[in-house]
């Protein structure tokens, strides 16, 4: 057996039914116990994005913290991941992506609430938080907290944080603009170095500018394609729903599609895209300027909504409208490139996808640098931060030259490992989550003067 085949077997085991059920089951439990908070309070959560928490303590604004999380979350999964999910499981995979995103919003709310509640100030005066802190301070299990932090550093160094993103950037630039991989790799590495050596505030500043711009550009282009093909939209949505339960209803009666394959593809890629339950977003949420854990939890859960319900849905619908998903000669980013070119009737569509992929992947690199750094500091202290950042920058450059299949196998393994300690903590601290939520909304109800503020 080769190393790649051994790692592939480990990957299949980690991302098998137990983890998928645990992730979805945790989301379902929290959804029910919190009274469908992700639906009832989504308008309030979206409103909080643009309102400061007066007197809140933290390093960056709640909006900047969300953008840092979105920078790490919105990446190649929104373009390449959706395409691979629909090709593997049919259009029905999009339906299961919607479902896992809906449940994942409750999970994201819970983990980011805990991040603010159990955060601390480090020796440099910065806010530090995330699963490692609420596992240690909430559950009192320090070895499990250290295990999570170790997995977090591994993901940043060898997983979704670096290798898949820079590989996607360099090869997309070569395919679309004929720019050599080495040239793009050097430029990306230098840009990443300039930003991350400035620390969390520089990452947050860059993310606050890049993330909204790239998301608006990508979604606007998708909407243009949808409007140009508006007469096909009802049939496309019906196909997505029908093939979720009857894959043979898919265009062309795609051979080998099953309900289980649609579910597995949609759930796995949905979670891979929005990261709900993996424990990454809480690390960014802990830096937010806020007094209220619940308030930040509400803000953070909008990240899953924006990532999957909005951005991934746009990709999925365009793939179905144009029929690109059912072309066996296409794979990965080329599927989405083809879909957007067909949808707009010009090669400009493919260019927009490549530019979107460039920005999405670049900001994912920035966001994961911060996540890995917080985990690294938890393990060894603040003194090794500069060494960590230099190592991260060098690994970014390396990712352009590694074999693509091996990159994604390693990324899947370490990304999946992060989820287990975090989900154990969410289940173990479920009473804290429920009590904090009830307390916040009770205080909000009795404050008749300002419904956006609560009284202590």
UniProtKB/Swiss-Prot annotation:
Pfam families on file: Na_Ala_symp
Main location group: membrane
Location in the cell: Cell inner membrane
Gene Ontology MF term list: amino acid:sodium symporter activity
InterPro entries in the cross-refs: Na/Ala_symport (IPR001463)
Residues that span the membrane, as ranges: 12-32, 63-83, 86-106, 143-163, 179-199, 208-228, 237-257, 305-325, 348-368, 390-410, 414-434
Topology with respect to the bilayer: Multi-pass membrane protein
Gene Ontology CC annotations of this record: plasma membrane
UniProtKB keywords: Cell inner membrane, Cell membrane, Membrane, Symport, Transmembrane, Transmembrane helix, Transport
PANTHER family with a match to the protein in the record: AGSS FAMILY TRANSPORTER, SODIUM-ALANINE (PTHR30330), TRANSCRIPTIONAL REGULATOR, LRP FAMILY (PTHR30330:SF3)
Family note: Belongs to the alanine or glycine:cation symporter (AGCS) (TC 2.A.25) family.
Protein name: Uncharacterized transporter HI_0883
Organism this protein belongs to: Haemophilus influenzae (strain ATCC 51907 / DSM 11121 / KW20 / Rd)
């Amino acid at each position: 057996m080769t190393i790649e085949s051994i790692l592939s077997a480990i990957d299949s085991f980690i991302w098998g039914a137990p983890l998928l059920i645990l992730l979805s089951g945790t989301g379902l439990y929290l959804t029910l116990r919190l009274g469908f908070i992700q639906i009832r309070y989504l308008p309030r959560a979206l409103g909080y994005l643009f309102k400061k928490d007066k007197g809140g303590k933290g390093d960056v604004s709640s909006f900047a913290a969300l953008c840092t999380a979105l920078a790490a979350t919105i990446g190649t999964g929104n373009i390449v991941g959706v395409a691979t999910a629909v090709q593997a499981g049919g259009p029905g995979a999009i339906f299961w992506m919607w479902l896992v995103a809906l449940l994942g919003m409750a999970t994201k709310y819970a983990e980011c609430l805990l991040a603010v509640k159990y955060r601390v100030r480090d020796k440099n005066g910065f806010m530090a938080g995330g699963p490692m802190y609420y596992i240690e301070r909430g559950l009192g299990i320090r070895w499990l907290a250290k295990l999570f932090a170790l997995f977090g550093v591994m993901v940043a160094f060898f997983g979704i944080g670096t290798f898949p993103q820079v590989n996607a950037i360099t090869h997309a630039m070569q395919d679309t603009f004929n720019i050599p991989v080495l040239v793009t790799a050097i430029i990306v590495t230098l840009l990443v170095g300039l930003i991350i050596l400035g620390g969390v505030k520089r990452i947050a500043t860059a993310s606050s500018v890049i993330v909204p711009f790239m998301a608006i550009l990508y979604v606007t282009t998708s909407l243009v394609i949808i409007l140009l093909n508006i007469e096909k939209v009802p049939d496309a949505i019906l196909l997505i729903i029908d093939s979720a339960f009857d894959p043979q209803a898919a265009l062309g009666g795609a051979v080998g599609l099953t309900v289980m394959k649609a579910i597995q593809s949609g759930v796995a890629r949905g979670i891979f895209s929005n990261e709900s339950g993996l424990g990454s977003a809480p690390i960014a949420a802990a830096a937010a300027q806020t007094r209220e854990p619940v308030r930040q939890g509400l803000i953070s859960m909008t990240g899953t909504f924006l990532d999957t319900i909005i951005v991934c849905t746009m990709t999925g619908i365009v793939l179905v409208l144009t029929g690109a998903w059912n072309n066996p000669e296409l794979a990965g980013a080329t599927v989405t490139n083809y879909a957007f070119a067909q949808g707009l009737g010009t090669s400009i569509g493919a260019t927009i996808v490549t530019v979107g992929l460039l920005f999405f992947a670049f900001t994912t690199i920035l966001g994961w640098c911060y996540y890995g750094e917080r985990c690294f500091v938890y393990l060894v202290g603040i003194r090794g931060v500069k060494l960590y950042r230099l190592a991260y920058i060098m690994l970014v450059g390396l990712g352009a030259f590694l074999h693509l299949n091996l990159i994604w196998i390693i990324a899947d393994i370490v990304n999946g490992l992060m989820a287990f300690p975090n989900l154990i903590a969410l289940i173990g601290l479920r009473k804290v989550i429920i009590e904090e939520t009830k307390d916040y909304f009770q205080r909000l109800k009795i404050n008749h003067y300002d419904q956006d503020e609560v009284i202590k």
